């Protein structure tokens, strides 16, 4: 009986674990958008309705980032975890990273 319970628990983890982890990896897009509107707008166009922050924006818009063919959640995580000379030394918590990544990925357009 005990081995049956252990096996059932392991199977549940295998079946439901990846789905829960995948949902957690992307965070909350609404929270990510709110954070990005406060922290990222000096250089990036964060929202599709936002006016460019500079006359000649140097940083790509979040829409352009989301729709670049090479953009993936893991790539965004690596980028946000690594300092870059053109970006301020913005340190995001793991939850903030997931939320911002969730927002960026929510901007990705469906391909036909």
What is each model feature region?
Residues 1-4, 29:
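Twin-arginine (Tat) signal peptide motif
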Residues 18-35, 50:
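Electrostatic cytochrome c docking/interface patches
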Residues 32, 36-47, 100:
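The canonical Cys-X-X-Cys-His
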Residues 48-51, 74-76:
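Short beta-strand/turn micro-motifs at beta-sheet edges
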Residues 110-112:
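Short, solvent-exposed mixed-charge patches
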């Amino acid at each position: 009986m005990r081995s049956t319970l252990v096996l059932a628990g392991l199977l549940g983890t295998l079946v439901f674990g990846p789905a829960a982890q995948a949902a957690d990896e992307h965070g909350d897009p609404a929270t990510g958008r709110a954070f990005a509107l406060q922290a990222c707008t000096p250089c990036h166009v964060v929202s599709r309705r936002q006016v460019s922050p500079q006359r000649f924006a140097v940083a790509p818009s979040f829409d352009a980032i989301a729709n670049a063919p090479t953009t993936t959640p893991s790539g965004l995580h690596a980028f946000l975890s690594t300092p870059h000379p053109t970006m301020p030394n913005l340190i995001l918590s793991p939850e903030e990273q997931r939320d911002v990544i969730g927002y960026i990925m929510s901007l990705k357009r469906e391909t036909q």
